[in-house]
Swiss-Prot record:
One Pfam family it belongs to: Terpene_synth
Family to which this protein belongs: Belongs to the terpene synthase family. Tpsb subfamily.
Protein name: Geraniol synthase, chloroplastic
Organism ancestry: Eukaryota, Viridiplantae, Streptophyta, Embryophyta, Tracheophyta
Keyword Metal-binding appears in the UniProt entry: yes
GO molecular-function term, one example from the UniProt record: terpene synthase activity
Described purpose of this protein according to its UniProt entry: Monoterpene synthase that catalyzes the formation of geraniol from geranyl diphosphate.
Ranges in coiled-coil conformation: none
Binding site for Mn(2+) 2: 323, 327
pH dependence as annotated: Optimum pH is 8.5.
Organism, scientific name: Ocimum basilicum
Recorded domain comment: The Asp-Asp-Xaa-Xaa-Asp/Glu (DDXXD/E) motif is important for the catalytic activity, presumably through binding to Mg(2+).
InterPro entries given in the database record: Isoprenoid_synthase_dom_sf, Terpene_cyclase-like_1_C, Terpene_cyclase_plant_C1, Terpene_synth_N, Terpene_synth_N_sf, Terpene_synthase-like, Terpene_synthase_metal-bd, Terpenoid_cyclase/PrenylTrfase
Amino acid sequence: MSCARITVTLPYRSAKTSIQRGITHYPALIRPRFSACTPLASAMPLSSTPLINGDNSQRKNTRQHMEESSSKRREYLLEETTRKLQRNDTESVEKLKLIDNIQQLGIGYYFEDAINAVLRSPFSTGEEDLFTAALRFRLLRHNGIEISPEIFLKFKDERGKFDESDTLGLLSLYEASNLGVAGEEILEEAMEFAEARLRRSLSEPAAPLHGEVAQALDVPRHLRMARLEARRFIEQYGKQSDHDGDLLELAILDYNQVQAQHQSELTEIIRWWKELGLVDKLSFGRDRPLECFLWTVGLLPEPKYSSVRIELAKAISILLVIDDIFDTYGEMDDLILFTDAIRRWDLEAMEGLPEYMKICYMALYNTTNEVCYKVLRDTGRIVLLNLKSTWIDMIEGFMEEAKWFNGGSAPKLEEYIENGVSTAGAYMAFAHIFFLIGEGVTHQNSQLFTQKPYPKVFSAAGRILRLWDDLGTAKEEQERGDLASCVQLFMKEKSLTEEEARSRILEEIKGLWRDLNGELVYNKNLPLSIIKVALNMARASQVVYKHDQDTYFSSVDNYVDALFFTQ
């Protein structure tokens, strides 16, 4: 989670922090419309109010009436959709398609109980075709429900091949295979077969489902960031001749309402950031609250996590400036003092710091303690030790990177990745989210943030973040003179070309996704809410950093505009 940095002559630089790279300005909260995104049409968009004639009182009353009308309509649509999910006379495959559309439109959080009831109910597999079997498999695993991949064996012929002519079935199979777990050879073979056939179909002008196939091969459904996918699919779904008008209307109303909520959250974050005044005092620091907020929406797309997004965006914004101290400004002796002060975590430790470090230390100290107070107030839990441990771990990681650069020696590949997960901000983010959400927290699992190794679900997501970060910014790192990146270290240790190193890293990411898929279905030690956050971190990483050229800044700027400012 990293942002762009100013150019300064340095004694050393460390690897950048990954929760942070991008938006260069925010002169006003509401920006011009983003031309690459089609505005969402709705009978009554909640994110913009039409001009109303009359005095302020009349306008206020009219606006209130419109909002009440929209709210009533929304409640009606929610009830109608719930009834459709609960109807006994609807074929199972139609319910699966409905669930798939609901979740892709970004409104699945309204129907979690009804969706789980459908997915856990008996399903007749006698006449099931490949499309339906793969859809059912994907939906079950996506929602954390166990299902065996052996259901696909019956679709193989005597040569062990699937039907190459069934494009719809192969597309569904390919999407399902992306939820495979390590050791599931059936799904690995299915992915290889389906991907090869689907890629060949793209060269056939009259091939069916050309657009859907191209999208799936670019980024499979399971790997897409929820809110961006909701926006994209709302526009696509409305063009389908058989779309459900009520479902589309509900999705648009909800999207506009969530966008208005995000704008309100951004207003609070930017107000806090300006009052904090950190970058006013530290002119070298990056000023990126908008992008920090984008990451929180990627990790926590559900509206109910509003306060968690706000607190996490604050933490990431401060982390960004600390990264700049280590990466572009601080002298080695000062960094040693700062690291020691973070370990001590008291105000007395701040006294020995240089002036420019004191304000940053105080901002971190106060903001973290405020989060701890809110958790104590809301849940009765004392979590300072847990949060503090992840901050100390991260700052020590920055210090380690500084030593690598200052000493002129590159680390080993595994050493770099393991340290880079921490300096990427992954564990700090998970700790804040886990305790701020507060679901399923026990004494036993709360200790997972005070000792190493961290849980596999967190380290796998963090490794994906680090690997995608390095893939997306390798050119920038090389030009900046960084001693280490995953690409460079793969090339050095494995004697690979840059292209070969990138391919190896992509294979590594695939393997880590299999680990995450296993955690989604089989991890019983952590609540599903935090496991989903881990998968969302991996998704957001790919969305932000996956590109063929160094186009990070424009892409992140586009995402911010599309999600928060384009109606």
